[in-house]
């Protein structure tokens, strides 16, 4: 009986016990919207031939802009153009000895490449070795005064020793390159930088280079040790004038960097509201390098006579009407202190009578048909331009057309920039289009329907007599004169130095150029005037013009960036690390 009662109680208790309810499934969190990466689009005319700012072959406004954002420099130009120490790279840089002249650099311990390799003494050594011994580089004279680069403190301190005092030393070791990646790279520093830069030491890095689409994407360098860039990406997109205007109107393009010319101004004139435009001179002077080492122009009188046949102003007005006429070998027209040094007449101005006299005094003569000959053979000049520089090609065609009218057989050829500016030679690829130049002077006929000689020279290559190309400006004037027009003299460090592509060397001028390079660049105007006068007599090159760019920006881009032309040697994108994304 007791067992039955216990069994009943157990059943009743079980019936009264509350069965727990199943817990509801967990509520999935609401997805949070990820912000779109911030981006700013810059329209550019061309991507250029490469990204090495030390090579004439890679010289372009885009190369200058990218280098300022990606490559480390010990000194950068301040608002007044005076070099200022970039403490993100070096905490100090000073002259520590005058005998021998020695500069000591203490590098920022945090400064490193995007590969996490420290920015160190080996990068100084690499740039010095390349600049002193390679052809086709810009402003090498200062590096050729260096006798040693010594490393201390595990590579974070550098002592640079010179063979003589060099007051312009602050202009050296800008745009350092990653030695650990380039020193053994195939194609050396030319081939390895043609399609980009392998590492960054600045606030941005090159993320992609798509030559087919015409686009370079800079991304924030997440390994940068200092204040990071505000923007996630900066897109540099190749566009023609019409596409730039359309993109600005639609808001697809925020800033445009174009050549200043009537075509872009016409395209922009149809926009409402009209975007803001600012002129931005480029850090180059377009010139005609005249081959003096051999060939028909080896005599200075022949070079002067050739120049007296050309209408430089007609060429400028036809190719780059807003460019600044360049009438000096040193400072560019946009630089403080510039003064024209060109003589009033030939060879700076067209003068057919003077040209005839100069050419005859150099041994030239006219044949029965009126064409020029030398050494009993018809004069046949090759006018070369870089295939990657279309404006230079237009100059080459105009020069060829003017000389053809004057009775000189000419052939205009294109060459890869690396070949033209290093070797002074070109393959026999004819520029077939011919444009008659505008005429501004009745003294030298400049319009003609005659085309240059169409038959290419025999063989796989040809020495170029007239090289259309850039001369870099913006550095120490004495250094630039010595770099561009000095003799390639052997030293204990560089026993076989490269010459310029034209091979120019005038020993009587060499000591003066060396003294100007070793001076402050501003302390002796009379010596600079003497150098200019001799250069106009010897004429290693004929200056044409300083190209001028146009910085175009929408109101929204202005508010977000405060864009300006920037320092001459860095350009309008110099402050892009601080830019914000424009309001859309």
Predicted regions and their residues:
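Surface-exposed binding/hinge segments that line
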Residues: 106, 140-186
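Ligand-site clamp/hinge motif
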Residues: 221-267, 409
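Append "and occasionally in soluble cytosolic enzymes with long acidic Gly/Pro-rich linkers
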Residues: 298-401, 584
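Extracytoplasmic/peripheral linker and loop segments enriched in polar/acidic and small residues
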Residues: 33, 316, 411-414, 418-420, ...
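Ligand/substrate-recognition segments at binding pockets and active sites
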Residues: 365-438, 443, 450-470
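N-terminal lobe/hinge region of extracytoplasmic solute-binding protein
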Residues: 43-98, 129, 199
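Gly/Pro-rich hinge or "lid" segments in bacterial periplasmic/extracellular proteins
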Residues: 174-229, 233, 352, 357
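Long beta-strand-rich cores associated with HINT superfamily self-processing modules
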Residues: 551-584
